[in-house]
Amino acid sequence: MSGFGDFTTICETAPLPLCAAVGPVLQATGRTGIEPECYARNIELANTIIFEGATAVMHIVALVMTVIMILHVRSKFTAVGRKEILSFFYLYMLLSAMSLVIDAGVVPPGSDPYPYLVSVQNGFSSAVITCLLINGFVGFQLYEDGTPLSVWMLRISTLAAFTISFLVSLATFKSWAGLSPTNTVGLFVVLYLLNAIQLFIYVAMQILLVTRTLHDRWPLGDIAFGIFFFVAGQVFLYAFSSKICNAISHYLDGLFLATVCNLLGVMMVYKYWDSITKEDLEFSVGTRMNNWEVKELLPEEERRATVFSEDLYGQNSSYDLPYSPGAARYSAKY
């Protein structure tokens, strides 16, 4: 029976990348790892074997969708928390790219770089969650968003989360500092317990923000959908991955569905941020094309009758008068 922090039960159900670097030494291969009961079949393309083909495609889709969301956020120049939420999407893009490299088998399990790349992936996972938590404080206006204080606090907190998760993961995989592939309590606490606590705090803060400070209640729907997609992804991955994999003949597994649900959850984060963020149109006009395009020329009479000719303190210029070939060179008052 597995105890607290043991990955045996988790890895037998979910085909996680870290499962190839934790657990006892396998007699068949002589390497450390826990083999899942069922995982998606490999795809051979151009004499290259691609692991988790469907999941790899979803990582590419996630990268494309993240680029689109980043472009939309960047177009809102005066939105509250613009720089902070951009950091979240940049980190999610890095996490998706690293997951694509690992899940597709670009660096195969058992190779020397594999533990380091999985440690980087775990570091990005913790960094994304911490960045989301810090973004949750921006809406309360405890400090001015976009200032060096706000941006650097976000960067330092995110870097600290990445460093802790990376070092704990690498120490576990390499048997450093009293940790080992069979002593995974520290890894479990960092990856699962701390991240779950941060997500709970973020959701609680956003519900409080909407109910106490906003008149519109529609953002609660975005929060609800985000929670639903995230929880559904975790259930698919950790509870039903093997059953799904066996039911559809190894074509898909829980990792694919978890990747889809995580992408939908991130999209709900964008939708929620966009719904509670107002933009000053005076400063965002530059993002729209043809704002000053002249649709139709004014008639001659309307173009000459300008407000400047009606100024009580101004003098009429000869340019305000219609041109006449026989008129005198000087004004009548001279």
Swiss-Prot record:
Transmembrane annotation, as ranges: 49-69, 88-108, 123-143, 159-179, 185-205, 220-240, 250-270
InterPro entries membership: Chs7
Cell compartments where the protein resides: Endoplasmic reticulum membrane
Domain of life: Eukaryota
Pfam family of the protein (one): Chs7
UniProt GO MF annotations: unfolded protein binding
One Gene Ontology term from the biological process aspect of the record: protein transport
Keywords, in A-Z order: Cell wall biogenesis/degradation, Endoplasmic reticulum, Membrane, Protein transport, Transmembrane, Transmembrane helix, Transport
GO CC terms of this entry: endoplasmic reticulum membrane
Topology relative to the membrane: Multi-pass membrane protein
Disulphide-bridged cysteine pairs: none
Homology family: Belongs to the CHS7 family.
Subunit structure: Interacts with CHS3.
Function: Chaperone required for the export of the chitin synthase CHS3 from the endoplasmic reticulum.
Protein name: Chitin synthase export chaperone
Source organism of this protein record: Gibberella zeae (strain ATCC MYA-4620 / CBS 123657 / FGSC 9075 / NRRL 31084 / PH-1)
Gene of this entry: CHS7
